Amino acid sequence: MSNIIKALEEEQMKSDLPKFAPGDTVVVQVKVKEGDRERLQAFEGVVIAIRNRGLHSAFTVRKISNGEGVERTFQTHSPIVDSIEVKRRGAVRRAKLYYLRERSGKSARIKEKLAKK
């Protein structure tokens, strides 16, 4: 029984997703339905959490919009998520960056990860 469920879940999982980690700045293209038409809306921010659960994986992106912090959680393999683009890699030493919620301005910056030679 569980083999059937596992096979169905693997069939629905997206394979074209880039590798990203907490601290990375990403642009998530989200499908937004307005009336009878559909368009793409970009949500750019820092990944503060990733939850790896196969088909039920999710990640949280945080951005500052008009001086107000906005967080949005996306299901990784959802049909609403059109694409994910990694803008820059962040060098962090935590899996969950919830401490960024209390910080603003320069203290909320994340160092850029340098490429290995």
Curated annotation (Swiss-Prot):
Annotated Gene Ontology cellular component terms: cytosolic large ribosomal subunit
Pfam family name, one: Ribosomal_L19
Keyword Ribonucleoprotein: yes
InterPro entries recorded: Ribosomal_bL19, Ribosomal_bL19_CS, Ribosomal_bL19_sf, Translation_prot_SH3-like_sf
Superkingdom classification of source: Bacteria
GO biological process: translation
Keywords recorded for this protein, A-Z: Ribonucleoprotein, Ribosomal protein
Alphabetized GO MF terms: structural constituent of ribosome
Function, in words: This protein is located at the 30S-50S ribosomal subunit interface and may play a role in the structure and function of the aminoacyl-tRNA binding site.
Record-stated family: Belongs to the bacterial ribosomal protein bL19 family.
Name recorded for this polypeptide: Large ribosomal subunit protein bL19
Source taxonomy: Bacteria, Pseudomonadati, Pseudomonadota, Gammaproteobacteria, Vibrionales
